[in-house]
Amino acid sequence: WVRQGLDLLDALGLEKVHLVGNSFGGALAMALAIRAPERVQRLVLMGSVGVPFPITEGLDAVWGYEASFENMRRIMDYFAWSRDLVNDELAKLRYEASIRPGFQESFSAMFPAPRQRWVDAMTSAEADIRALPHETLIIHGREDKVIPLSNSLTLADWIPNAQLHVFGHCGHWTQIEHSARFNRL
């Protein structure tokens, strides 16, 4: 995936970019910055994977999603702290997207059980993370049930030029649950 990201930058003729990575995408953004630091200006990591942690019940449920409206409704409860955001209408939209031809097959092939191995595979070495020279904004929801807040605390400790912002009353959807404040960051 990192190679694909670098190939995309090349295809678009982009020499140096700001990278924003959410969750699994945070691990990929960080891995790309480690592999090709000269291609990255700044990093934004949101509820990021990339450091060691035991898989959460929420992440295991999300990665193990089997298409049904009920399952979609259930996993959405892991994403948001605010019950106002989790409703049947949104669950229906996300469920319908999940049953498009080919989606379920490709999604389930990405993270088959046992899933802890995929968390471990996305982990970057501590020394590599500590060597990142980039200004890095780390954002996390305090009540995140998918990726533990401790991940962002570790990243903030290890990345020399990191700033950490934790949103209270917020789950894994920082950009949705606190959109106006998130955008001001």
Say what each PLM segment does.
Residues W1-G21, N183-R184:
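Active-site loop/oxyanion-hole signature of alpha/beta-hydrolase fold enzymes
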Residues G21, G25, A29:
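Gly/Ala-rich beta-loop-alpha elbow adjacent to hydrolase catalytic centers
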Residues M30-R35, V40-R74:
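Flexible "cap/lid" loop of the alpha/beta hydrolase fold
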Residues E66-R130:
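Conserved alpha/beta-hydrolase catalytic His-Asp/Glu region
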Residues L132, I138-H140, D144:
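Short beta-strand/loop motif that positions the catalytic acidic residue
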Residues P160-L185:
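Catalytic active-site module of serine/aspartate enzymes centered on a nucleophile-bearing elbow/loop
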